[in-house]
From Swiss-Prot:
Catalytic activity from the UniProt record: a quinone + NADH + 5 H(+)(in) = a quinol + NAD(+) + 4 H(+)(out)
UniProt superkingdom: Bacteria
Pfam families in alphabetical order: Oxidored_q2
Gene Ontology annotations of biological process type: ATP synthesis coupled electron transport
Keywords: Cell inner membrane, Cell membrane, Membrane, NAD, Quinone, Translocase, Transmembrane, Transmembrane helix, Transport, Ubiquinone
Keyword Cell inner membrane in annotation: yes
GO cellular component, one term: plasma membrane
Protein name in UniProt: NADH-quinone oxidoreductase subunit K
PANTHER family found in the cross-reference section: NADH DEHYDROGENASE SUBUNIT 4L-RELATED, NADH-UBIQUINONE OXIDOREDUCTASE SUBUNIT ND4L
Gene (name only): nuoK
UniProt membrane topology term: Multi-pass membrane protein
Regions crossing the membrane: 5-25, 30-50, 62-82
EC nos: 7.1.1.-
């Protein structure tokens, strides 16, 4: 049995669904929301690589590397902002973020 395009798309759909559920079911913790966004980006990358391999074109794989780079930078900056926010406020709850308005 070979692993075809449908298998990759099914795994990507499951990861995408888990990411969406993580965002909608847990709106109180910013770290969980950030991790859910990363799951969504991972699902998109799996789709890009799967279609790129299926079509025999390398552009999708190059774009997936670009998306991974941007996602890593986004996660690093987001976590750094959360650490500073936690040190100042003592909480990372979404309800407390509106206090940052200034």
């Amino acid at each position: 049995m070979t692993i075809g395009l449908g298998h990759y798309l099914a795994v990507a759909a499951m990861l995408f669904t888990l990411g969406i559920l993580g965002i909608f079911l847990n709106r109180k913790n910013i770290i969980v929301i950030l991790m859910s966004v990363e799951l969504i980006l991972l699902a998109v990358n799996i789709n890009l690589v799967a279609f790129s391999t299926f079509l025999g074109d390398i552009v999708g794989q190059v774009f997936a590397l670009l998306v991974l780079t941007v996602a890593a930078a986004e996660a690093a900056i987001g976590l750094a902002v959360l650490v500073v926010y936690f040190r100042n406020r003592g909480s990372i709850a979404v309800e407390d973020v509106n206090l940052m308005k200034g």
